[in-house]
Amino acid sequence: MLNYQVKIGLVPLRRDCTPRPGAFNWEIAEERGRAIVDYIQTHYPSKNLSFADLKGVIPVETFYAESDVEKVAAHMRREKVDAILLINANFGCEEAAALLAQAPRVPVLLWAPLDERFDADGMRYTDSQCGVFGISRQLQRYNIPFTFMNSCRVDSPEFAKALERFARVTCMVKNFRGMRIGQVGMRPKIFCSVIFNEGELMQRFGLHIIPIN
């Protein structure tokens, strides 16, 4: 039975470092992360799409510490999320993000909102785009497949379109894994284009081919 309900885990990120003025300010990153999560949960749920956040899981609701990986991963498993959205509220911690993405083995979407807060002298308070570079490279090192969304505002049409596309792909992956497929007869000899490897389908995707003779 196909299931079209998709739940995405929202994981805002910041850097685990000594706080200091400017781009490594903890409070601004945490405030930004909570605001983005609240906006997504308010404006993007639908009949088939819901979200899970980190409220009550870690104190500041923004993920940064490797020591919290198992706690957050366990929460995502309890919530039965079908995918994870990594949100660079600031420069995220790439090691913690990769370890978390590795745990539930679900589709991952990596995104950084546009940096928008600047002082008159050019001082910026976030460096979200740089975090995407670091995290994407670490995900590659761990051989974790992921999707990237271009930097944009959370209230933009670009974000809405990319989120919907990711949710649709997640739905497909969710229903594809573990599928039982009935094979009625053998392929026609002349159609070499439909040759498949039953063992590889089982190993890679958990698909079961059921011969029906």
Please describe what each predicted stretch is.
Residues M1-K174, G178-N213:
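Metallocofactor- and cofactor-centric catalytic cores in central/energy metabolism, strongly enriched
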